[in-house]
Amino acid sequence: MHIDWFVLLAQLVNFLILIYLLKRFLYTRIIQAMNEREAKIAARFDEAERLKREAEEAARVYEEKNSFLQGQEEKMLNQAREVVNHRQKEWMDSAREEVDAIRRRWIETVLQEKAAFLEHLRQRTGKQVFAIARKILDDLADTAIESKMVDVLIDRIHSLDPAEREKICSALEDSEEGAIVQSAFALFPEDRQRLTDTVRDLLGKPDAVIRYQESSDLIGGIEFLASGHRIAWSISDYLEHLEQDFDRVLHEEVRQTLPKPSGESVMPSEEQRP
């Protein structure tokens, strides 16, 4: 069985970095925020219970004072009960609305912080993995990672089926701008020439125009673009799987920690999550 040590090592480094960042930056903040929210919610419920007890005490005193009235006792007691029930319902409804509002704001805050953290983690992890991979290749193979990316792109171009090659050839004929090769870092001149020769020979277009650009949006990747056709390889492909796993773990952790009210879901469903 062939083992791709480059991919294995990159995934291992991704996992170690993820565990470290999760423990150092995110978990403590989430627990602290949840504790603060829980304290506020508990305070609201305590206030509601206090108001309820006060209302019940007021009803008891009211009933005792009016028990001496003749003829109007039942009527006044009924009025007192109605007042108490109405006030109690108002207080409980108000407390419930405030608790629900606090919970919704907390969920929105967590989701926003999670999205920002995931994006920051994705960018930072990608750069660190790319730097580590570059160092490993330099140390072990005396080969720049940019050259390896070109090798991968050339292999993917060679693996195109005839129908896909024909589509790309037609696109190049119809386009005045030619093809574009974008990479996260500048390619060496010899790698550019090697890639240019490969594309021209394989597609049978010796005069095909190929322009090279650098794009900060690519995280350790390279892509070939020709009028809507795209052939690419990028570390971000691996990071997307890592981000999905992290998102799932984070969602499960928050769902288990946050208290769930009856009849209401704490966290949004998968369709509602960003």
Swiss-Prot record:
Pfam families documented for this protein: ATP-synt_B
Domain of life: Bacteria
Subcellular location: Cell inner membrane
Membrane topology recorded in Swiss-Prot or TrEMBL: Single-pass membrane protein
Keywords per UniProt: ATP synthesis, Cell inner membrane, Cell membrane, CF(0), Hydrogen ion transport, Ion transport, Membrane, Transmembrane, Transmembrane helix, Transport
Chief localisation class: membrane
Entry's transmembrane regions: 2-22
Any one annotated GO CC term: proton-transporting ATP synthase complex
InterPro entries listed in its UniProt record: Alt_ATP_synth_F0_bsu, ATP_synth_b/b'su_bac/chlpt, ATP_synthase_B_chain
Main function: F(1)F(0) ATP synthase produces ATP from ADP in the presence of a proton or sodium gradient. F-type ATPases consist of two structural domains, F(1) containing the extramembraneous catalytic core and F(0) containing the membrane proton channel, linked together by a central stalk and a peripheral stalk. During catalysis, ATP synthesis in the catalytic domain of F(1) is coupled via a rotary mechanism of the central stalk subunits to proton translocation.
Family, per entry: Belongs to the ATPase B chain family.
Matches recorded under PANTHER family: ATP SYNTHASE SUBUNIT B', CHLOROPLASTIC (PTHR33445:SF2)
Self-association state and partner proteins as the record states: F-type ATPases have 2 components, F(1) - the catalytic core - and F(0) - the membrane proton channel. F(1) has five subunits: alpha(3), beta(3), gamma(1), delta(1), epsilon(1). F(0) has three main subunits: a(1), b(2) and c(10-14). The alpha and beta chains form an alternating ring which encloses part of the gamma chain. F(1) is attached to F(0) by a central stalk formed by the gamma and epsilon chains, while a peripheral stalk is formed by the delta and b chains.
Protein's name in the database: ATP synthase subunit b 2
Species the sequence originates in: Syntrophus aciditrophicus (strain SB)
